[in-house]
Each structure stands twice: as C-alpha cells, then as structure tokens.
Amino acid sequence: MPQSAEHVLDHVELFRGPEYQQMLAKKKIFENPRDPAEVERIKEWTKTAEYREKNFAREALAVNPAKACQPLGAVFASVGFERTLPFVHGSQGCVAYYRSHLSRHFKEPSSCVSSSMTEDAAVFGGLNNMTDGLANSYKMYKPKMIAVSTTCMAEVIGDDLNAFIKTSKEKGSVPADFDVPFAHTPAFVGSHVTGYDNALKGILEHFWDGKAGTAPKLERKPNGAINIIGGFDGYTVGNLREIKRILELMGIQHTVLADNSEVFDTPTDGEFRMYDGGTTLKDAANAIHAKATISMQQWCTEKTLSFAAEHGQDVLSFNYPVGLSATDDFIVALSRISGKEIPEQLARERGRLVDAIADSSAHVHGKKFAIYGDPDLCYGLAAFLLELGAEPTHVLSTNGNKAWQEKMQALLASSPFGQGCQVYPGRDLWHMRSLLFTEPVDFLIGNTYGKYLERDTATPLIRIGFPIFDRHHHHRSPIWGYQGGLNVLVKILDKIFDEIDNKTNILGKTDYSFDIIR
Amino acid sequence: MSLATTNSVAEIRARNKELIEEVLKVYPEKTAKRRAKHLNVHQAGKSDCGVKSNIKSIPGVMTIRGCAYAGSKGVVWGPIKDMVHISHGPVGCGQYSWGSRRNYYVGTTGIDSFVTLQFTSDFQEKDIVFGGDKKLDKILDEIQELFPLNNGITIQSECPVGLIGDDIEAVSRAKSKEYGGKTIVPVRCEGFRGVSQSLGHHIANDAVRDWIFGHIEAEGKPKFEPTPYDVAIIGDYNIGGDAWSSRILLEEMGLRVIAQWSGDGSLAELEATPKAKLNILHCYRSMNYISRHMEEKFGIPWCEYNFFGPSKIADSLRRIAGYFDDEIKEGAERVIEKYQPLVDAVIAKYRPRLEGKTVMLYVGGLRPRHVIGAYEDLGMDVIGTGYEFGHNDDYQRTAQHYVKDSTLIYDDVNGYEFERFVEKLQPDLVGSGIKEKYVFQKMSVPFRQMHSWDYSGPYHGYDGFAIFARDMDMAVNSPIWKRTKAPWKEAPSAKLQAAE
C-alpha cells in the first residue's frame, strides 16, 4: 500500500507505484487502444514538414487558440471604475466562466452578474431579464455604476441594450440618473481585446456624450492632464501601479482610465472588498478635458482612441512597451506632451536597466525565441528581444490581424536580429507546435497553455502573458517601465540559466560545465 | 470552537431562520419571495430539506451556476479521452473550460487522446449570418486528417448554434456515413437551455443513449470475455485521479471494472457498458439518466455509492458486494480490513486537529451531501450546505441520509447570500468553488475548493481520504489565519477568534 498517514502521497506520486501502474495497464484492454507502434508513427508524423503543411492548410478548425471572447475584456475593463458592477446580458454560464478565468489568473475574487437568459428569453427577448436584473443588482450589491455588456446569445437574438436600459429605468429598476453605460460585445467578433475597447468606449461615451440622451453632452475645456489606458493586461496590477509611479515622479496631472490595479489585488485582513480603487466616475467624466489620451496597447483601444480624438484630444498609442527603447519612447512622449522634465530618478532607473542588460546580454544574445500572445504583448516582447540581441523567430497572435502583421514585420525589418523571423496572425497553438518541431527555437514565451508545447517539443517555456494559472503572483510585479524591463530580463535569464544547469548536471558525464559562476 | 456549535439545536434553528429572514431583506419584494423558497433550515425526520430547486436563477443576483454546455462538454463528454470534442460556436466557452476540470487520463495527448486540447469552430460573424453547418463539415474533415487516431467526435453546441437554425444532426449523419460509420455525436447543449449545468448532463446522457447505444449492433461483442463480476463506474470524472483510487478498491474486492464514465474513459468503454452486471453510480445527479436507461433497456441494475471517507466507503463496499456472491462479500470485508490501519492512522493524526471544527459547503452534483461523512470521520461538523444545480431527489437523499437537524440549506445560493451566511455563522472552513475561494479567504475564513480539490486529490477511496484529511488540516490550521490583522490595529473581533 503506497499511502500512509505519515507521508501522504497525492496525485503527483500516488499513481506511480506498482499497484496503480498494474491497475492502469489492465484497464487498457477495455479501452480498445490503438497499436502503440501506430501511435508512435503518428506522433513522429506530426513533427514533420508534411504535417505542418496540412496543419497550416486548415481553414475551419481552431486547435488551442490563444484568445478569449469579447465579454471577458469588457468585464476586465468595467471593474476598473469606482464601485462598478459588470452586468453581462445573456446566458449565465458565460459569467461563471469569466469570473473563474479571472480568479484563476489573479488569485483574487472576480465579481460580475448575469441577466440569466434562458429559452423563453431566446424567443421573447431579454428585456425582463434586464429589468429584473438591474433592480436586483442595484439593491444587493450597491454599485455606483453598472456596466452592461453582452454574450453572443443576446447578440444573436438582437437585444437592444440602449432601449432595454431606458425601459428598465422607466420601470424603476435603477434611478433615472444612475449610471448604466453599455457596450455590445459579440463573442463572434474579435477577441477579449476588442471587448475591452468596446466597453471602455461605451463608458467614456456615456459620461462624455450625454449619458444616452439623458444629460447634456459635456463641453470639453482642455487642461494639461493626460489620460492613460492600460488595455487588457494580465500584469495590470503591477503595470498600472508602475505607470502611476512614473507619472507622479514626473509631476504629470493624469487619470488612469479603467484602473483595476486595486480590485485585483486586495489585502486579506478579514474584509472582502467587492469593489476597491478604480477610476472615479468624476474622473472618468473629467477625462474629456485632458490634453491627450495615451494607450499602452494600440490593438486594445482602437475605437476608444478614435473616440478621444474626435473630442479634440491628442492621442498616442504604444504596443505594450517593454524594455529600454520602448520605455524611452514612452517617457519622452510623456515629457513632450506634458511639457514636464524627465526627473533624474528615471534616468538612474534607465541606467540600471542598461547596466543589467550589459551584465547579462551575452547569455541572451543570439538565442532564438518563439512568442505568442495578444498582438500588443507580442510586439512589445519582440522589440525587447531585439534590443537584447536575441532573435525572435516565430511571432504568433491568434487575435492579431493584417495591420498587426505589417507593423510586426516593419519592426523586425528594422533590426539585424529580426531578419529570420516570421509573423503569424490568426494562427493557433497547434500551428505553433508545428513551427517548433520544424523550425526549433531555444525558448518559447507565452501563457500557461505554452506548457503543453514545452512538453511536446521540449522548448523551455518562459511564462509571460495571460492567463498564467500555474505560477503565482507574477501579475503583482510590473513588466512596464525600466524596472519592469528588469523584471522581464530576470525572468528570461532565470530560464536560460536553469536550462544550462539542467543540461550539465549529470554526475561524471556533463557536470564539468556545471559552473558555480555564470 | 466556533460560534455555531455553542448553542442547542433549537437555538441554532432559530438563529438560522432569523439569518434567512435577514438576508431576504436585501431583495426587491418579488425577488425575496422567489429566493425564500430556496433557503431553509433542515428539520430532522423530514423527507427533504424543505427547499425548491432546479428552478431558473434570478437575473442580476450573481448566481454561481453555469450552463448546459458546461454540463455536457465540461462534465460528461469532455473526459472521454479518445474522442475529439468540438466546442461549436464562438471561441470563449472552449477557452474558459480548457483543461480546468482536472479530468486525469493516460494517453498520448494530441495523438490518441484529446482531453486537454481546445477544439473550436471559433464562430465569426459570417458563420452567424450564413450558418455554421458548412464550417462544421470542413472541421470534421480537418480533424480526420490531422488527428487520424481519434476514435470519435462530439459536437458540443454553444448558444448561437440553436438560435441560427443549424442542423448539426444532419451534418453528423452525413459525415459519419462518409467516414464508414464513424461515431460522430451532435449534442444540443446550448448554454441557454435549462436553468443550470444540470440540463446539460441530461442532454449529454441522452446523446450517449441515442448516438452511442443507438448505433451499437445488438450482436456487438466486447473485445474481452465477460465475467460475472463485471461492473462499470458511472459518474466519476477522475478529478485528480478519483476514479483510479476508487477502481483499485473494486478490483481488490474481486470485481472487474469494464468501463469508467467518464473520467479516463474511452468510447470502447461506453460501448461495452451494456455488458456490465452492475452499474455503480457515484454522481447521481449527472448520470442517473443513463443508469436508468441501461436498467430499462439492458436490465442492468444500478446502485449508488459514496467513496468519501472510511465510514461511507465501508458502507458502499458492502452495498456493492450485496449484488454479488460470497466471494465478493468476503472481498469487501478483506478490503475494509486491509485499509483499517491506514484509516486509523489518518484519523489518529488529523482528528485531534480538526475535532469540532465547523464546515459550510456549496458545491455541485453529489458533493454537498457525499463529503459530509468524510468530514464527520474527522470529527468535523457540517453546519450548512446547498446545491448549485441539485433537484429535489438530491435534497431528499441529503435529508434522509446526511445532514443533521437544523443545518442551514441554501439552493442556488448567490454571492450576497453566501457571504452573509458565512459572515454570521463563521465556520472554520468553507468548501466551494474558485469563484468563492478568494472572497472567503479575504474574510480570513479558511477555504478549500471542492470542485477541483484545489489542485490536489484524489479524494475518493481510502488513499484519497488521507489526502482529504491532510488538505482540510492544512487549510483550517494554516498559521496565516492568525496573522491577518495588523498587530497595531484593533483587537481581533469575535469573528476572527471564531476563524481561529
């Protein structure tokens, strides 16, 4: 018997002993298993160029896509406002999924409600669900704002949020002047980054453009402030805090829009804070007067930035700035737009990042990397690798489009280290599997699901992205700013050194290289 | 010692009733009336728990429930390892349910096993406008080409499929014919159907009936010689290896397990199940339908069992053995005896650390009742429980066999109610899901996920009980719960002392 009270074995070890192994071997006869030789043959075949060609010829099937659907991004953006309850109109299972997904990544509560539409709503529309739902949410959870988005069910049947919210207010679900911004977020268009954009634009439109016809439109009186938008970001906690620190160092008047850095990082002290932090509704409204709106992620904010530009603001977007040059560009832009000087403190932080790169770049230089993730994240990481002298080789974004591809290609063309790199918009992780077999690289950068690629292709995975379910707390540290760049560098170096150690640790065989100093 | 155990049964009953009244005050009148039917205090001797169940969730309340797709793809079909399960519709559903349920299996993933792959038709706007059938047709071809060792395919419908009038049954039939009778199963588990995951279980069971059992030839032979001791494990999803730590006991008592439904299961096992002499049913809620069907159609008896905690395991082994001859009955006694030293050692180690601690549960299919015995084996006291998607027959079983007098019962509880109940009752442990975990930990209440075993497990069987005991101890007795208040802040409140 393998189990004992003194040394309790769980799933990691329990099944490895002879009792369970014999049991599992005996189970095989009931499974009608494939011939092991055939399994081996197909396994090897999936590694070939021939398989890759068939794999890339896929037109309909997606296997292991690296993207989620719009409402997830809408929920993520909505909780970044003061006491705001995201309300997703449609089937209720979706909301259970978004909440679970966000909680698994952040290891934090994730509050969101559904209008719980079922068959009858599919036939008659979901107006009653909206009316009852708003009334219940308002009374139970005492929000300051309810931000409505939609699941694909409500979109397919064509529910009209604007009309439904208006009717619900007339029926007294919430007070007439209670803020209920909305955004249509069909899951069959775009991805979670699109949903982020739609929801944020919906909220700004609500405050700036007369609250769906119930208030006068705000008149813009330009001031010197800058709005910052983080975009959909698994590192939102660390990153937004770092950006705010930089803005404060520079003395720039600012508003971070959709600031969810507090709600996804509340303390454990005996109190559950369903709402915490967030952009105040007053600040959201006053953001119209800002001189400029800066987006840290272009493809998360295309509509939102156009909207800000239409209101007369200067707009500027980055592509998930990571590392030295991208942070330089960001800091210089902040200084240019605000007219503020860049403080010596930031120059020192920059110098420290340069110092660290100079100390360590020999270990990164020339290493080949595959990267996948959201379009902006891929761009930012590729740019950083180029300046480390590393060679991005495959860059894949399931939710990247043609414009993204072109921009990526221009970036790669600008560096001698980017010459051997291919860009793959709209592809998935099963495509990546073929790439890693046919054109191997030294390291893979991606989210938790990359561990399947690491297992299959033996490409070491550096976990950067969303979601990260199987490592804890990394979202609390920034990867933006010079300090964030240092964190990314350390993540990459740690994996590189671990790999060298793993390859050199066999006693008496390879351990001549098992160096104590690297 | 928590507040909850310091009173008499009558006092607890009165307090729980009062608590329910207090919670209902938050609602608009109409909602309060509806929710009142789902909350109650169990009265000893009653045949059920006195709550309504399996009724639509109320909009806007933050129900914890999921949908029919989650019940079919996520629970019943997803673990069948040698079939490809397509999440048919937009990308999200498959993405959020990808690999998160911990249905363990042995196989070469991507080659002959597919559980932890995310296959989706990733619907775009044009698929909604023009329909998804042509795309589905092509997807099936692409699966055949790229994953040639798959033994079958299921199509798990997401919401839009049923709204746009796609005929996935016709596509399935045509493609099955094209591929020489290949098993292709269309499942109408659109998320808007029914009130919870529960209808998805039922729809998935019916799909097995119609598209697996309906297609095996009457003369179809299992590829093994039947014995009088062949049983099938029904309703065990092998979370963290649960079905394995169950199977080993059944085989040690002399039975032969010919199929696992559905954790680490295969199409061949589903097809062979009509040859079983007895179906043993763990998750009654999700698989009673197919068990009843096999009883009617193939004359296979079924019996429920419970492999959580030594008391219930011993009862169950004896109950299962009761369907067989003396050899098996002796086998059951032999197994119970064999594991008794392990049970004694686990209880000797952990019971003193857990004795008298109170627990509140809120889980899915069988666990709101099934795990109560395991807690009691450790001296713990379940003071509140409820089902996410239970029906009245679940509450009957709970009332008749599991809960104590005056236990607080909450059906389809929502975020608000659950927080208030826990805040007032201050249990020493809450067992629920990922959406609840961090809420209660913030409140300094120890917590274990009772869907995923909090990434531990198995919890079934004797081997699993040792892990269960270890895990409950590490949650309840983690030193961190005594350090959640900053020392310079006010003295700990009564609720914090309770949590200690």
Curated annotation (Swiss-Prot), chain A:
GO terms for molecular function: ATP binding; iron-sulfur cluster binding; metal ion binding; nitrogenase activity. [8Fe-7S] cluster binds at C69, C94, C152. It comes from the Bacteria. Its cofactor is [8Fe-7S] cluster. GO terms for cellular component: molybdenum-iron nitrogenase complex. Pfam families: DUF3364, Oxidored_nitro. Its EC number is 1.18.6.1. This molybdenum-iron protein is part of the nitrogenase complex that catalyzes the key enzymatic reactions in nitrogen fixation. PANTHER family: LIGHT-INDEPENDENT PROTOCHLOROPHYLLIDE REDUCTASE SUBUNIT B. NCBIfam families: nifK (TIGR01286). This is Nitrogenase molybdenum-iron protein beta chain. It comes from Bradyrhizobium diazoefficiens (strain JCM 10833 / BCRC 13528 / IAM 13628 / NBRC 14792 / USDA 110). The gene is nifK.
